[in-house]
């Protein structure tokens, strides 16, 4: 199969890269084993977005694509971002939030001294979001007036998981029954908290399981029925917002006609000649392209491999009497550095802090191979970090695979910005008749 650009990985960075490359006019193939780390994603874009033209353009592109996909995100009016309530009950700051969560900005809610406040709603069949615990932590950490109530979802759920409950919320008949129950349980005729002079909270937080597809209609119906703003909490794994994102963005990209997904496929071979990747392949098919985006995730996503022994290289320091002091633990240097398995890229990072590891790249995100790895995955592995050399001319790294630093670990903002830029550069390179890399397209 032949494409202009092949994206390896379909997590957040991979999807943004595919959308960006397609917007640049490229015919794009996406190869992935799964939806990447989206199943672990809270749904929020956290971390400092930073400044600069690239960041502004990337975030605008993300917001516009989300609107077209039917999964709108909101950017906070305040420069500091949204202050949202995490499932732990503590505050979490986000630069971007899905429409389903953005109404939960804590700065718009009254404090404990100001009457009605936030109601945390829980479901008795869903143990991942215990309303009483979340409310107690929120009162302690935010200073807001917070109460809680729980309601049952009925026998249809049993003790189901988040995905099972989300599918139930897509059932229109069942949801109408849930609306009636929510009115009775969450909005009582008498004051909903002792000492308050109103029966209605300022806002209600729900677990983020209000449907895989009908969530926007459900939130609107709940807000109208309950008479106050309603929002979802940031997600815990398995993430329903992450599943929504993958489904809605994939559908939009496929419907636009420039992106083809090869899901459930694992790249196991690469063909590199003269510093350029010519093809990648799974067990059955070879995919050729003029440019490639590598968005396979870091150590957690399988984009970097680490020897199991590296996770257990922990010892106790000897005390003054020569015995091991169990209160003075230290981490030995990792016996093996993380290895990038597809191109045998030269990697760097800070000891056993795996979030800091990633391939060495130039300023455009093009990675360097290790010495002796010119033949790609079919060449013999080198034994140590290779000398610096020219980067692969038509491969761009994006997302968590880039790694982070002690001060800033990888986050969703990094995935969005790096994915947008990698896709843009790959499309620009693929459009050149001679296939040679040009400068950053402006």
Predicted ranges, named:
Residues 268-286, 292:
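Conserved beta-strand-loop-beta-strand element in the redox core of flavoprotein oxidoreductases
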Residues 19-20, 302-308, 392-394, 398-433:
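A conserved FAD-binding loop/helix module that cradles the flavin
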Residues 135-140, 175-200, 204, 211-268:
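Helical element adjacent to the flavin cofactor pocket in flavoenzyme catalytic cores
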Residues 1-3, 283-291, 391:
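Core beta-strand elements of the Rossmann-like FAD/NAD(P) dinucleotide-binding domain
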Residues 30-51, 158-166:
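Conserved N-terminal glycine-rich FAD pyrophosphate-binding loop of Rossmann-like flavoproteins
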Residues 370-376, 382-407:
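Short FAD-binding loop at a beta-strand-to-alpha-helix junction that anchors the flavin cofactor
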């Amino acid at each position: 199969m032949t494409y202009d650009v092949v994206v390896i990985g379909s997590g957040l960075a991979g999807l943004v890269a595919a959308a960006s490359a397609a917007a640049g006019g490229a015919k794009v193939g996406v190869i992935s084993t799964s939806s990447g780390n989206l199943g672990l994603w809270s749904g929020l874009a956290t971390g400092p977005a930073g400044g600069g033209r690239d960041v502004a353009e990337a975030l605008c592109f993300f917001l516009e694509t989300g609107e077209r996909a039917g999964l709108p995100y909101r950017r906070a009016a305040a420069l500091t971002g949204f202050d949202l309530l995490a499932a732990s009950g503590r505050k979490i700051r986000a630069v971007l939030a899905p429409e389903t969560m953005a109404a939960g900005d804590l700065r718009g809610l009254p404090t404990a001294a100001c009457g009605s406040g936030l109601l945390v709603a829980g479901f008795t069949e869903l143990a991942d979001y215990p309303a009483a615990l979340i409310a107690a932590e929120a009162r302690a950490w935010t200073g807001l007036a917070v109460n809680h109530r729980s309601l049952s979802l009925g026998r249809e759920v049993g003790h189901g998981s988040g995905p099972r409950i989300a599918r139930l919320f897509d059932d229109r008949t069942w949801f109408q029954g849930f609306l009636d129950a929510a009115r009775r349980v969450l909005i009582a005729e008498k004051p909903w908290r002792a000492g308050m002079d109103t029966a209605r909270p300022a806002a209600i937080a729900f677990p983020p399981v209000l449907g895989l597809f009908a969530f926007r209609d459900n939130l609107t119906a709940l807000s109208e029925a309950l008479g106050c703003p309603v929002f979802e909490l940031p997600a815990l794994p398995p993430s329903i917002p992450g599943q929504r994102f993958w489904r809605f963005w994939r559908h939009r990209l496929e419907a636009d006609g420039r992106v083809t997904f090869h899901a459930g496929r694992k790249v196991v071979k690469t063909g590199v000649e003269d510093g350029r990747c010519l093809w990648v392949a799974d067990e059955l098919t070879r995919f050729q392209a003029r440019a490639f985006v590598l968005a396979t995730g870091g150590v957690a996503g399988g984009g970097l491999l680490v020897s199991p022994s590296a996770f257990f290289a922990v010892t106790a320091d000897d005390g003054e009497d020569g015995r091991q002091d169990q209160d003075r633990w230290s981490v030995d240097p990792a016996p093996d550095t993380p290895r990038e398995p597809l191109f045998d890229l030269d990697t760097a990072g800070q000891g056993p802090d795996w979030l800091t590891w990633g391939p060495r790249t130039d300023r455009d995100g093009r990675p360097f191979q290790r010495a002796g790895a010119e033949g790609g995955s079919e060449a013999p592995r080198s034994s140590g970090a290779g000398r610096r050399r020219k980067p692969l001319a038509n491969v761009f790294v994006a997302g968590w695979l880039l790694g982070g630093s002690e001060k800033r670990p990888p986050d969703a903002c990094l995935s969005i910005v790096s994915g947008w830029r990698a896709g843009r550069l790959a499309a620009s390179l693929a459009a050149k008749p001679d296939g040679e890399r040009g400068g950053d397209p402006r």
